[in-house]
């Protein structure tokens, strides 16, 4: 079985000490053991947020030109953040109360909710050019006034498009509802799907994005360690574990915690992907799936399976070890294919046959997906379609890859997931929480 796919340069020995120092030649960002603090310092160049903002916008505008887009109109909160680096809480992400216009050339314009939100944006975003933060016009839930308000929103967008002289060009949209679509098309705009350009930009990470993903993975690893060695005990409820993870990860710098899946005993088969108030019993297998937004908006999403009592010496049964090895081996077989020049087909061929094959749809269980400032960035891999429609894997993509022993009639089962950077030399596993020792022998 594979245990680590970190691949550095050829061995390089320091003649004075005999130590292998090859890791010093590799990029800092590619090494999960070399991590910057979340804070800033005068003596070390850590995450450079000005560079992060500029490189994200540059990548996005380059992809827009590939698709011949004069501008993008963004409604999804994560896309607005990617383009403008504005953030005012996760609650605003997907309710269409703010938007941004990004021209293929020039500075983006942010439309922020009026009132104190608008005032805060003008204070918090000095990198936005003067006049490029404006009041958003909301239209959803405007009972009796939806067409009127959507029309005003469209007018505000058109004003920016005319300022950049792109109103006659193709305008990409990432996500919108029917009233907004109708209002924009009523102005004669050539509306096209803008998501492919956004996706291509976001799935390939910048150096600073990789450093932030590394920070997020370190917080997730620490939370998993706490679960295994401190919190997981007979008589504890699944939701108690979830609550402790929330508190711990927020204290360590996460912005927001999504649902933490804690499935124990019979809740692992069939697998219930949420936590309940069920008591965890000694000997239960416990699947924990951590989904959280780490420092500056970058995700951690990974899974471990524990044995309740394992930290106190209770061993897995031979059947449980076999299931764990099955999942581990299929996951790492897929990980080994995450290298530049391969395709998504190379990865999913290593996944077990499952309901993705049976129903030709994604179960999100034998699966890999790009992660970044959202849990699902832009590339999913599944046996449902990836073998027939392969997509290229590129350097600096970052994936969560997960497999599952989803056999029928099991009393309990296992599931695992890792977070992996695609480096020039192959896959680098960023999630470092150890696996069950007896299953690794």
Where are these regions (language model features)?
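Active-site neighborhoods and metal-handling regions in enzymes and metal-associated proteins
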Residues: 1-441
């Amino acid at each position: 079985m594979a245990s680590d796919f970190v691949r550095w340069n050829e061995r390089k020995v320091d003649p004075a000490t005999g130590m292998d120092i090859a890791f010093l030649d590799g990029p800092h960002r590619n090494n999960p053991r070399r991590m910057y603090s979340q804070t800033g310092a005068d003596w070390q160049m850590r995450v450079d947020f000005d560079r992060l903002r500029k490189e994200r916008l540059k990548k996005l505008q380059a992809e827009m030109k590939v698709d011949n887009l004069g501008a993008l109109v963004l409604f999804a909160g994560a896309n607005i953040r990617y383009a403008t680096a504005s953030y005012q809480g996760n609650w605003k992400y997907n309710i269409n109360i703010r938007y941004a216009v990004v021209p293929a050339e020039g500075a983006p314009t942010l439309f922020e909710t009026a009132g104190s939100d608008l005032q805060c944006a003008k204070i918090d975003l000095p990198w936005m050019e003067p006049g490029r933060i404006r009041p958003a016009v909301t239209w959803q839930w405007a009972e009796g006034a939806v067409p009127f308000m959507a029309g005003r929103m469209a007018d505000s967008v058109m004003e920016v498009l005319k300022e950049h002289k792109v109103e006659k060009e193709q305008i990409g949209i990432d996500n919108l509802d029917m009233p907004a679509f109708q209002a924009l098309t009523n102005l004669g705009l050539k509306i096209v799907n803008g998501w492919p350009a956004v996706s291509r930009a976001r799935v390939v990470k910048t150096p600073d994005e990789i450093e932030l993903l590394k920070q997020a993975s370190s917080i997730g690893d620490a939370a998993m360690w706490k679960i295994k060695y401190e919190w997981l005990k007979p008589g504890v409820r699944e939701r108690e574990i979830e609550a402790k993870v929330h508190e711990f990860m927020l204290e360590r710098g996460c912005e927001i915690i999504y649902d933490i899946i804690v499935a124990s005993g019979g809740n692992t088969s069939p697998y219930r992907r949420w936590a309940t108030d069920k008591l965890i019993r000694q000997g239960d297998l416990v699947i924990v799936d951590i989904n959280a937004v780490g420092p500056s908006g970058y995700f951690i999403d990974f899974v471990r399976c524990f044995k309740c009592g394992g930290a106190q010496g209770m061993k897995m049964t031979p059947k449980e070890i076999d299931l764990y090895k099955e999942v581990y081996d299929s996951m790492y077989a897929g990980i080994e294919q995450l290298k530049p020049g391969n395709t998504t087909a190379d990865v999913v061929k290593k996944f077990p046959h499952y309901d993705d094959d049976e129903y030709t749809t994604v179960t999100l269980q034998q699966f890999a997906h790009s992660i970044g400032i959202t849990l699902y960035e832009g590339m999913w891999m599944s046996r449902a379609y990836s073998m027939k429609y392969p997509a290229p894997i590129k350097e600096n993509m970052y994936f969560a890859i997960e497999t599952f022993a989803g056999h029928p009639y099991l009393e309990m089962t296992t599931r695992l997931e890792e977070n992996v950077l695609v480096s020039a030399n192959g896959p680098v596993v960023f999630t470092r929480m150890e696996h069950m020792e007896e299953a690794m022998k």
